[in-house]
Design a protein with these regions (language model features):
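Membrane-proximal basic amphipathic "stem/tether" segments
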Residues: 6-14, 19-75, 414-420
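C-terminal amphipathic helix plus adjacent low-complexity
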Residues: 39, 361-420
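Active-site and donor-binding regions of nucleotide-sugar-utilizing enzymes
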Residues: 69-226
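Conserved catalytic-core segment of nucleotide-activated headgroup transferases in glycan assembly
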Residues: 77-88, 205, 215-289, 359
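Short acidic-hydrophobic, aromatic-tinged amphipathic segments that line or gate anion-handling sites
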Residues: 113-118, 294-298, 354-365
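A donor-sugar binding/catalytic signature common to diverse glycosyltransferases
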Residues: 132-139, 143-156, 300-344
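Nucleotide-activated donor-binding/catalytic signature segment of Leloir-type glycosyltransferases, i.e.
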Residues: 284-300
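Catalytic binding pocket for nucleotide-activated donors in carbohydrate/polymer assembly enzymes
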Residues: 318-386
Length: 420
């Protein structure tokens, strides 16, 4: 027989009021983030806690004052910037170099747990290195509590900053939550910026104040000039049909399926007098319909292909500055410019920077290349605005790394956590 309980009216109203406020708060959280998001948040917290527990053991190991660690998740092999810095460092100093590069997809939902062996190796080297150099967001660099003696340099993998990233690109509560929990771009000692103009945007994107920034240029600018002839001959040996031809290089940034209009520009140049090189982003899965005059040249990098390009078409990537450093005619194919201004957003207006060489229509762009002479002052002014150092850039960058990192005599080698 079911027992009956008598509750006073006042208690009923109080209970209802408490329940109302409780469920109102829960519903607000669910509407803002969602239950799955809340679970993910606590899984991230648990993952980071476990990583730091493991890392505390590695931090008992001594620091090698001549050890420099390079970390990247942009590619499975070292970038030209990393390789040139390593070469110059080894020439200037007696250093121990460790390079760890592995491409990690941006699905943060399970990234903490699927890459544990990699993270453990990174933790060992972070705990025993004096200097760490990264070219993008790296989980172990940002979420771990490091020794005070570890100096971390961020040399962002893109020469420019046309499109927003990092903190300036966060649009939703979910993105903000993920960025906060994964401590996005935390723990950097110094961030390298190619100009005062770019530094202004980097401060917003990385979330750092003035004293964390150093002026310096990526070594790729030097590489483009010193290896121009060598790269051209390599490509000509592989593609002898490129000799004495007018070549158009198209190197767009990544697009998801459904937003990609690359096929339109391929069609515009098919059966023309130009050879067309299509160099899409590594993450692109779209298949294109191409003819015999279109090449993908997948065995060569965009930097190498710039050596044979007579015309360069790109959009919001750093390729525009890389091509401009060689005074190549640069055209912006910004068919989704209005959408990009909304998400992720633009730091500076490429439509204003390039004027009549900015296009949203592929056939109009083709007509411009085919019939109009290019005003190279446009790319000269553009490059000089966003990149200030052009001579001995690798040596100057390595000098900064040595001065601010390896020769930091005031470092305390005891086990202190690095302050933000």
């Amino acid at each position: 027989m079911m027992k009956s309980f008598r509750i006073s009216k006042g208690k009923i109203n109080g209970a209802r009021l408490t329940a109302f406020f409780f469920f109102d708060i829960v519903n607000r959280v669910r509407l803002t983030l969602g239950v799955e998001c809340m679970i993910q948040k606590y899984l991230i917290k648990v993952g980071i806690f476990l990583l730091n527990c493991s890392y505390s053991v590695f931090k008992l190991l001594p620091t090698n004052s001549n050890k420099v660690l390079f970390l990247s998740r942009q590619s499975n092999k070292p970038s030209i910037d990393f390789r040139m810095i390593v070469s110059q460092l080894e020439e200037d100093r007696d250093v121990k170099i460790v390079i760890m590069t592995k491409r990690i997809e941006k699905n943060m939902k399970d990234v903490l747990f699927k890459n544990v062996p990699l993270f453990l190796r990174q933790m060992y080297h972070l705990a025993t290195s004096k200097v760490c150099i990264v070219d993008g967001y790296n989980i172990t660099v940002s979420v771990l509590n490091h020794k005070k003696c570890l100096i971390i340099f961020q040399i962002w993998h893109s020469l420019g900053a046309a499109k927003k990233f990092g903190y300036s690109a966060l649009k939703t509560p979910y993105q903000q939550m993920i960025a906060k929990e994964l401590k996005m771009h935390k723990n950097y000692s110094y961030i390298i910026a190619p100009s005062m103009e770019i530094k202004k945007y980097f401060k917003q994107c990385f979330g750092y104040k003035e004293d964390h920034f150093l002026l310096g240029t990526l070594p790729r600018i030097e590489y483009l000039k010193t290896h121009h002839r060598v790269n051209k001959e390599k490509i000509y040996r592989k593609y002898p049909q490129f000799r004495n031809k007018k070549i158009v290089l198209y190197a767009p940034t990544f697009r998801t399926q459904g937003t990609d209009r690359t096929q339109e520009i391929i069609d515009a140049f098919q059966n023309s007098k130009y050879l067309f090189i299509l160099k899409v982003h590594p993450n692109t899965k779209t298949k294109y319909h191409i003819s015999n005059c279109v090449y993908d040249c997948r065995e060569f990098s965009t930097l190498q292909l710039l050596s044979v390009a007579d015309y360069v078409i790109t959009d919001y990537s750093g390729t525009s500055l890389e091509a401009a450093s060689l005074k190549k005619p640069v055209y912006i194919y910004g068919y989704d410019f209005e959408d990009y201004q909304k998400d992720p957003g633009m730091n500076y207006d490429l439509k204003k920077e390039f004027g009549k060489y900015f296009f949203e229509d592929a056939h109009a762009l083709y007509e411009c290349i085919a019939h109009e002479k290019y005003d190279k002052q446009v790319v000269i002014d553009y490059f000089n605005k966003y990149v200030v150092q052009t001579q001995d850039v690798t040596q100057k960058l390595v000098d900064l790394i040595i001065e601010k990192g390896l020769e930091d005599e005031e470092t305390d080698y005891r086990l202190f956590e690095k302050t933000s």
